[in-house]
From Swiss-Prot:
Organism: Brucella ovis (strain ATCC 25840 / 63/290 / NCTC 10512)
Protein name as it appears in the record: Adenosylhomocysteinase
Known EC number: 3.13.2.1
Named cofactor requirement(s): NAD(+)
PROSITE patterns: ADOHCYASE_1 (PS00738), ADOHCYASE_2 (PS00739)
Sites where the protein binds NAD(+): 193-195, 227, 256-261, 279, 314, 335-337, 380
Amino acid sequence: MTASQDFVVKDISLADWGRKELDIAETEMPGLMAAREEFGKSQPLKGARISGSLHMTIQTAVLIETLKVLGAEVRWASCNIFSTQDHAAAAIAATGTPVFAVKGETLEEYWTYTDQIFQWPDGEPSNMILDDGGDATMYILIGARAEAGEDVLSNPQSEEEEVLFAQIKKRMAATPGFFTKQRAAIKGVTEETTTGVNRLYQLQKKGLLPFPAINVNDSVTKSKFDNKYGCKESLVDGVRRGTDVMMAGKVAVVCGYGDVGKGSAQSLAGAGARVKVTEVDPICALQAAMDGFEVVTLDDAASTADIVVTTTGNKDVITIDHMRKMKDMCIVGNIGHFDNEIQVAALRNLKWTNVKPQVDLIEFPDGKRLILLSEGRLLNLGNATGHPSFVMSASFTNQVLGQIELFTRTDAYKNEVYVLPKHLDEKVARLHLDKLGAKLTVLSEEQAAYIGVTPQGPFKSEHYRY
C-alpha cells in the first residue's frame, strides 16, 4: 500500500496505467467533456471544497478531474470497500488530489478514509458533499447529533455501525466540535443512488435535513440509463468474471423489478438464462410479467435457482432460510448499494473458503455449498469494473450540474431534496447523442404550439415517466 501525508492508494506506480485508461474513458464520456468546455473558463466551482464519496473507478476519475477543471478542490474516498480500481486511484493521487481508496478495504479503513475526505490541510471544513449511498452525509449528521448530546452511538445494529460509531467517537475526541462545524459549513449535497436518496427523504420527512440536497438518482438520464442500461451490461460481467459459469439455460432469480432490476433481468436473459422475478410492488410485478418474466416468491423459487441476485435497496431480501433451501453451488449476489440485502452475517458461523478476491464458497453443515460474490456487496463493481464509461457520463454530468447549481445558487434552495429541472435532464441526453450518431427531429413552430411546448423543449411534463 502506498500512503503519503494526504493520500492512501494500493500502489502509486499504477498511475501510468490508470492515466492510459482515463484517456480512453474521456472519449466515451462526452457529457463530462462538454461540461469542461462550457464551464472551464467561468470556473463556477471556484471556492468549492468537495468531499466526494463515490466508487473510485476510472469513470469517477474523469468526474474528479472535471470538477477540478471547473475550479473545485476535491478530496475523495470510495463508497464501497470492494469497488475501487487501484490504478484509477493511483492516477488521481499522482495529480496531487487527495484520494483515500484501496480495493478490499477493511471496515475500519473504510470509515477512516471517509473521515479523511473532511480533513483539509488548513483545518477548515468542506462546503459541498458529493455522495453515493449517503455514507459521507450520514457520517457528518450522526456525528453532529452525538456532539449535541443525543444518544445515537450506544446501540449499533450491525458490525458496520460498530465501526462507524467508533470512528465518530475517535474524531470527537481528536477534534471537539468538528462535526457541528462541518455540518454548518455544507452548502449542499448531491446524491447518486437510490439508497442514499431514500436516506435524504427520510431526513427531510423528520425535519432533520440541515442543508439542500439534489437527488441525482431520479434524473431521467441517471435512473433510466445508469440503473437500467448500466446494470444490463455490468451484472453479467461481474457474474462471469467471478465464476466463469455458463448462464445459458440456467435459472436466475432477480429480486426486485425497479430500474436496476429491469436492467439485471434483461442482462441475465440476454445471456440465455431463464429469468424469474420477485416483487412486492404490484405495478412492477405486472411490468415483469408483461415483459415475459415469471413472477414468483423467493420462498418458492429458491430451491430451483442457479443464480439469485438482489436489486431492491431493502434489507433481508435473501434470508438464511432462503439460502438453506438453495441447491448446491447456487450463485448468490447483490447489485443494490448495501450488503444487507442478503443476510451475510447469518453465514459467518459456517465454513468459508475464499476462492479468489471477492468470491467465497460457503459450506453448510450438510455439505451444501453456495458461491457468494463480493460478500453481498455490489458484485458488478466488486467482481468486475462497474458500468461502462458512456452511461456513467450521463450520471456524472448530472452530478456536475447539481454541484454547480447548489454551490452557485445556495440561497434559492430550502433544506429539502430536489431533482434537476427537466431542461437540464434533456441537455444531458442531448450531449450524448452525437457519440451514437443520433439525429434529432426538430419540431416546427406550429407542431410545438399544437402540443404546448417550444421547439427547443422541454418536451415532457415533470410527471412524465419515460
